[in-house]
């Protein structure tokens, strides 16, 4: 038989006998590599090592260091989970069990209601299956045969999945010991490869995500190649749980979500203090970058949303109402309102660039199951801005937006990486304009010396964009900021300006948001700082702790002076021991605690403690007062 040739990532070509599998090929390359390889990327597709080589294909072998390798190992872990459940509860019916980001899950239909204690039993059975090191084999069968096969096993969900496939489909299954599952793969060679795993939680999940269908039991888990990696990940999760903004939001009195308004957060006084500081900072930065602030209405007519395209493409996410027998909608986005502000007057080329910024409250109908603290809500404030400009101003304006983003993220010690998302298949607009817009984004980010990666085809249909992914103190990334060149709304709304030639032209429009959502950003910062906010942001900046009742008057006089200069201060005048008061203030994560007793009253001093336990000792009150005012003003 003729040889087949494959191309490796370094560009080199390797030839093998026809019929050679990917798994056999990697052994020829390196035995040590073969022990680590879990799957392969063939012409951009994640592929099972059991598959035969295809002549001329580009092949990259994947280990656990690669996303495809992680996906494959965790997919196999989900099958081991399913096999363990079937051993323990043979009557259980299996639905789906994919790998997901950071782990895997399996949806199961069974009479027994799973408990956290059951997870331990399942893990023990999974460990037995791993120890058995069962070879994993792939088989295929015609569609009708597969339907009959799974019907005989009473696996109704598998039958439904197969019935949705075309009649000529070839159905693939994977087996390990006496367990077989419908699956497209890929999977690792044997169950023994999955050495480090942990089942994490149980949740409810509707079959196929449809609340009209039966509620199944979903078991979540994760898997790693090495136990040390699993332990490190679980430690990270423990730390993240301590920092959960929902938990800290309640403990610190920042916000609450009531059953009367699911997805609609209430900001409490301390939460508003924090929020106001963020908004003040936002306004200062935008003032420095020559933005003008606007505010647009929350409710606007159906006609506007038809023009913008939201009525046809986003209506299911919008809240609507009737006013004077006409349909209106609560805005899900600020952009159309910003366009109306632009259209309030005819503009000349001399007016550009125009920079309009808005902290605009928007509402979107999210499914109740998707709601999550401040991270996923139904009402939130977007820090949107729309920059209207001439074509030759595009790169300069983009660079200014990039500078603005850097200034804001740097204030919070947030590292970030940037992705340039390019033209998708369903793009609207002229190819030349797309190329010019993409090139302008690329040139701007390169001119600022900021590393970025290309995210091909992931731009919006109306324009390319820069997506900012910020990294918090635990190393987790969050997609926040977006800089978008919008070629859709200017066209839909027919916005114009009078050019130097006296003719009407269409301006270029940048749509950008840095925080993304004020609520979500507050949630991220709460977890980033573990609730111990910098002094300028802290809801309570100073807590004065009188040792006894006779020191309360002095404490209140100090608080009065600080309050007059807008320092957020509280006095703990309860009849409690000073050690208890200090612990309570530490738990409230107040940046500064001032202990006052006889000595302090007599000398006009305060004994200063910082959150975290540092004792700064006794200092004159005026000295402390001046230093904290500078710290707050300079946002150190």
Features from the language model and the residues they span:
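NTP/phosphate- and nucleic-acid-binding module
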Residues: 1-75, 80-95, 100-636
């Amino acid at each position: 038989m003729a040889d087949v040739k494959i191309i490796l990532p370094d560009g080199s070509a390797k030839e093998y006998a026809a019929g050679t599998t990917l798994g056999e090929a990697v052994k020829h390359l390196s035995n040590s590599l073969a022990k680590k390889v879990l799957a392969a990327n063939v012409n951009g597709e994640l592929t099972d090592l059991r598959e035969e080589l295809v002549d001329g294909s580009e092949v990259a072998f994947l280990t656990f260091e690669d996303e495809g390798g992680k996906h494959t190992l965790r997919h196999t872990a989900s099958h081991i989970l399913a096999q363990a459940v079937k051993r323990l509860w043979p009557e259980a019916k299996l639905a789906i069990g994919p790998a997901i980001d950071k782990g895997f899950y399996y949806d199961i239909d069974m009479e027994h209601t799973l408990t956290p204690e059951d997870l331990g039993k399942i893990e023990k059975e999974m460990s037995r299956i791993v120890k058995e090191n069962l070879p994993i084999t792939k088989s295929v069968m015609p569609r009708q045969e597969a339907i009959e096969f799974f019907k005989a096993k009473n696996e109704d969900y598998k039958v439904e999945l197969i019935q949705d496939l075309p009649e000529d489909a070839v159905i693939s299954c994977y087996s390990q010991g006496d367990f077989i599952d419908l699956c497209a793969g890929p999977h690792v060679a044997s169950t023994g490869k999955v050495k480090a795993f942990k089942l994490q939680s149980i949740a409810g999940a509707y079959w196929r995500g449809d609340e009209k269908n039966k509620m199944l039991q979903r078991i979540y888990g994760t898997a790693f190649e090495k136990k040390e990696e699993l332990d490190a990940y679980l430690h990270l999760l423990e730390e993240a749980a301590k920092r959960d903004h929902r938990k800290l939001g309640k403990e610190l009195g920042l916000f609450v979500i009531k059953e009367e308004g699911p997805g609609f957060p209430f900001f409490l006084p301390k939460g508003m203090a924090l929020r106001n500081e963020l908004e003040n900072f936002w306004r200062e930065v935008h003032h420095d970058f020559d933005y003008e602030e606007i505010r647009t209405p929350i409710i606007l007519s159906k006609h506007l949303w038809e023009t913008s395209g939201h009525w046809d493409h986003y209506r299911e996410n919008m809240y609507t109402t009737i006013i004077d027998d006409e349909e209106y909608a609560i805005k899900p986005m600020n952009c159309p309102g910003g366009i109306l502000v632009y259209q309030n007057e005819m503009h000349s080329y001399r007016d550009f660039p125009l920079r309009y910024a808005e902290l605009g409250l928007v509402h979107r109908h999210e499914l109740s199951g998707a709601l999550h603290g401040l991270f996923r809500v139904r009402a939130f404030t977007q820090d949107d801005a729309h920059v209207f400009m001439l074509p030759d101003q595009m790169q300069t304006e983009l660079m200014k937006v990039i500078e603005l983003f850097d200034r804001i993220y740097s204030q919070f010690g947030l590292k970030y990486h940037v992705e340039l998302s390019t033209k998708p298949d369903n793009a609207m607009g002229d190819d030349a304009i797309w190329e010019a817009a993409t090139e302008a984004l690329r040139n701007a980010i390169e001119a600022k010396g900021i590393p970025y990666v290309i995210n091909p085809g992931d731009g919006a249909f109306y324009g390319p964009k820069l997506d900012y992914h910020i990294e918090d103190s635990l190393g987790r990334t969050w997609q926040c900021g977006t800089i978008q060149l919008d070629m859709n709304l200017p066209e839909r709304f027919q916005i114009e300006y009078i050019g130097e030639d006296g003719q009407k032209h269409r301006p270029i429009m940048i749509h950008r948001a840095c925080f993304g959502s004020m609520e979500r950003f507050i949630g991220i910062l709460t977890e980033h700082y573990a609730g111990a906010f910098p002094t300028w942001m802290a809801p309570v900046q100073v807590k004065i702790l009188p040792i006894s009742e006779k020191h309360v008057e002095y404490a209140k006089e100090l608080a009065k002076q600080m309050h007059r200069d807008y320092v957020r201060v509280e006095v703990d005048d309860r009849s409690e021991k000073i050690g208890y008061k200090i612990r309570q203030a530490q738990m409230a994560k107040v940046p500064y605690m001032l202990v006052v007793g006889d000595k302090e009253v007599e000398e006009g001093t305060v004994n200063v403690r910082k959150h975290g336990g540092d004792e700064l000792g006794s200092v004159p009150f005026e000295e402390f007062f001046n230093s904290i005012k500078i710290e707050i003003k300079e946002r150190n």
